[in-house]
């Protein structure tokens, strides 16, 4: 199973995160399938590769809670069909 989750980057006390599609069994810093976005909580900047995110969501990828909140704020779920917006 594939999840969309945050991968920590940056230095101490200055964390930035990549939004990645990654296998559930992998560690947080493990090898990702594809980088699909970027999130900087300090500057409150977000970059999303929307076509790649939609591709993984259509294939059944599950976003984590934090990634789901980021995607809701960016209104990515409006581009999905109404029956595809339910996640565990």
Swiss-Prot record:
UniProt xrefs under Gene3D superfamilies: 3.30.1320.10
Record's subcellular location: Plastid, Chloroplast
Signal peptide location: none
UniProt key word Cell inner membrane: no
Transmembrane segments: none
MF annotations from Gene Ontology: structural constituent of ribosome
UniProt keyword list: Chloroplast, Plastid, Ribonucleoprotein, Ribosomal protein
Family designation: Belongs to the bacterial ribosomal protein bS16 family.
Record-given protein name: Small ribosomal subunit protein bS16c
Organism, as annotated: Helianthus annuus
């Amino acid at each position: 199973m594939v999840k969309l989750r945050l991968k920590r980057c940056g230095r101490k006390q200055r964390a930035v995160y990549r939004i990645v599609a990654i296998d559930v069994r992998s560690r947080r810093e493990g090898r990702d399938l594809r980088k699909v976005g970027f999130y900087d909580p300090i500057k409150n900047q977000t970059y999303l590769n929307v076509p790649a995110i939609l591709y993984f969501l259509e294939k059944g990828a599950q976003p984590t809670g934090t990634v789901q909140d980021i995607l809701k704020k960016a209104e990515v779920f409006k581009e999905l069909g109404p029956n595809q917006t339910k996640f565990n």
